[in-house]
């Protein structure tokens, strides 16, 4: 079982779970510094605290989608060992990572003349994706076969619902999800968007609330 770094399945967490899930790294750029998510030896908890502070400081922060060659190299050991692979990715509506994984899948399957790699569009992001990978890993441990796990994964993903709010909507504006005029009004009256993953693999507004209670 594989997932991309958008799954929030950090190495220490997977070690505690004792799950056989392999995470394909993703590139994170902060100003002029480039990190390989989960590959670089960093304190994830401390880095997360600094990361959100840097977001509030409006630093130049962005991620780069995993490219097809990254997936091919990540899969190589298991492909060479004759294993079949199920890979979960960020929702295709918010990242090109799914398409990259599909390109890698097609190249590997065509080369071997049979289905070795199957890619699941998680239709969500963050731990919603991670939860799906964990569920699939559980089924592997129970002895389910490849086809049965694939069928269950495609059903189970619609049982996972991810909802969240954002502290600042500037990133929604950058993505064109909110107009600058509406944004000014929202900031003025302190509205928070309630967001969710949609069934067509996009992020959509599900509601609006005033303030945030912690």
Predicted features and spans:
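N-terminal glycine-rich anion-binding loop in soluble enzyme alpha/beta folds
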Residues: 2-70
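Short catalytic-loop micro-motif centered on adjacent basic/acidic residues
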Residues: 1-2, 62, 87, 119
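Short glycine-rich or small-residue beta-strand-to-loop segments that form or flank ligand, phosphate
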Residues: 84-92, 118-121, 135
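An N-terminal domain-start capping segment
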Residues: 1, 89-97, 177
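Mixed-charge interfacial surface used for oligomerization/domain docking
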Residues: 6-22, 27-33, 97, 101-106, ...
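Hydrophobic residues in alpha-helical segments
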Residues: 54-55, 79, 140, 173
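Glycine-rich phosphate- or other oxyanion-binding loops that anchor nucleotides, phosphorylated ligands
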Residues: 56-91, 99, 103, 150
């Amino acid at each position: 079982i594989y997932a991309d770094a958008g799954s929030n399945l950090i190495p220490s967490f997977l070690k505690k779970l004792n799950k056989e899930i392999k995470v394909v790294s993703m590139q994170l750029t902060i100003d002029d510094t480039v990190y390989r998510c989960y590959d670089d030896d960093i304190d994830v908890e401390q880095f997360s605290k600094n990361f959100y502070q840097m977001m509030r400081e409006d630093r130049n922060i962005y991620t780069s989608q995993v490219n097809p060659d990254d997936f091919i190299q990540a899969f190589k050991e298991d492909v060479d060992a004759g294993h079949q692979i199920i890979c979960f990715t960020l929702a295709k509506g918010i990242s090109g990572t799914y398409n990259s994984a599909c390109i890698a899948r097609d190249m590997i399957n065509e080369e071997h003349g049979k289905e070795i790699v199957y890619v699941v569009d998680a239709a969500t992001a963050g731990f919603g994706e991670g939860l799906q990978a964990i569920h699939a890993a559980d089924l592997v441990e129970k002895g389910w076969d490849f086809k049965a796990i694939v069928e269950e994964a495609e059903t189970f993903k619609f049982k996972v619902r991810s909802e969240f709010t954002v502290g600042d909507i500037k990133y929604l504006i950058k993505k064109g999800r909110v107009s600058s005029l509406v944004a000014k009004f929202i900031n003025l009256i302190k509205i928070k968007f309630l967001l969710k993953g949609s069934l067509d693999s996009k992020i959509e507004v599900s509601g609006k609330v005033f303030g945030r209670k912690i």
